[in-house]
Design a protein with these regions (language model features):
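Short, flexible turn/loop "capping" segments at secondary-structure junctions
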Residues: 1-2, 69-71
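Short aromatic/hydrophobic contact patches that present stacked aromatics
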Residues: 5-7, 50, 76-78
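Core segments of cupin and vicinal oxygen chelate
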Residues: 8-57
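Vicinal oxygen chelate
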Residues: 10, 14, 24, 55-59, ...
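A charge-rich, low-complexity, intrinsically flexible signal that marks solvent-exposed coils, linkers
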Residues: 40, 73, 156-157
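Short beta-strand/turn micro-motifs at beta-sheet edges
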Residues: 64-67
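C-terminal cap/linker of serine protease catalytic domains
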Residues: 131-157
Length: 157
């Protein structure tokens, strides 16, 4: 186990979430599933208690802890994309699997985890600053899923 791992709290379906992430994102995998050795307040002996997985190279643990805690936008995974096809693939996988759209390239999966599906053309423009950054930013603001061609056009002016 790595020295630093992100632990995500799930109600009871960390294993399902980890499998989805492993199937959806590159450099992602499902690792060990640790089963509860005895009954606990929100589960029974033999239920998946923790699940080790990797999302885009980031080590994580999913903890099936019950309904006490909910996810918020205060934590999100940001996935950099190279083109519209890649942006669409991740966005559609998340939203099409019971997730929901939000603004400015953000969406939530069906477990409540927030994702930023962010084309590099946008982050590159913002990093450079100046008028092109302002135009790219203004073009992004009304979008849900980012339209790469619209951002490219905004950068060009």
């Amino acid at each position: 186990m790595p020295k630093n791992t992100i632990c995500l709290w799930y109600e009871h379906d960390a294993e399902e979430a980890a499998r989805f992430y492993a199937e959806t994102f590159p450099q992602s995998s499902l690792g060990a599933v640790f089963r509860a050795p005895a009954d606990y307040p929100d589960g029974k002996a033999g239920d998946a208690l923790t699940v080790e997985f990797t999302v885009a190279g980031i080590p994580c643990i999913g903890l099936n802890g019950g309904p006490q805690f909910k996810h918020s936008e205060a934590f999100s995974f940001q996935i950099a994309t190279d083109d519209q096809e890649e942006t669409d693939r991740y966005w559609n996988a998340i939203v099409g699997n019971g997730g929901q759209e939000s603004q400015c390239g953000w969406c939530k999966d069906k477990w409540g985890i927030s994702w930023q599906i962010t084309p590099r053309v946008l982050t590159d423009a913002l990093a450079k600053g100046g008028d092109a950054a302002k135009r790219a930013f203004e073009a992004m603001m009304p979008m849900k899923k980012i339209d790469v061609a619209a951002i490219e056009a905004a950068v060009r002016g």
